[in-house]
Regions:
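Walker A/P-loop
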Residues: 13-54
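Buried, small/hydrophobic-residue-enriched core segments of structured protein domains
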Residues: 2-4, 97
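Pre-Walker A adenine-sensing motif
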Residues: 4-15, 81
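Short loop/turn elements that form and flank the Walker-type P-loop nucleotide-binding site
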Residues: 17-19, 55, 79, 85-87, ...
């Protein structure tokens, strides 16, 4: 692994929330896997590291109404989404070059405010979301790239 790549992994491990994340433009390959393994090893023990499916729904990402708990409680009960669940952790976003502008805006807002505001289904909640985003941009050509807003 080249020195610059290792330095970037080390910097991200020292202050992941402060840096917000990294865009890693590389195809799925051994070098990329080695960099991700290095980052995992350098992060403090117990730091959550989760993959984000490209087609994740807004409810799974942001949260929403927990229908079962709402019916049982007789009042609206919020279900936290992945962005709130990942507070203090690292999210791996594979195929970031395929991310929609709307999804990029959601991630960007969370990175900027370090919180998730859930306003839907009669809910109005704010959850801490101090996370780090590792965007894996696997674009094969110059016109395939992740949204510039990230």
């Amino acid at each position: 692994m080249q020195g610059e790549a290792a330095t970037i992994a080390a910097l991200l491990a020292v202050d992941p929330v402060g840096l917000g994340g990294v865009a890693l433009r590389a195809p799925a390959c051994a070098e990329r896997d080695a960099w991700l393994a290095l980052l995992r090893d350098l992060l403090p023990r117990g730091t959550p590291l989760r993959r984000v499916p490209l087609n994740i729904s807004d409810t799974a990402l942001l949260g929403g109404l927990d229908l079962g708990a709402t019916l049982q409680a007789g009042r609206p009960v919020a279900l936290q989404g992945l962005l709130a669940q990942a507070d203090g952790g690292v999210l791996l976003l594979a195929m970031a070059e395929r991310m929609t502008a709307a999804a990029a805006a959601r991630f960007g807002s969370v990175l900027d405010t370090r919180s998730v505001r859930l306003q839907r289904d009669g809910l109005d909640s704010v959850y801490a979301s101090r996370l780090t985003l590792v965007a894996l941009d696997e674009g094969a050509s110059d016109d395939e790239h992740m949204p510039a807003s990230l």
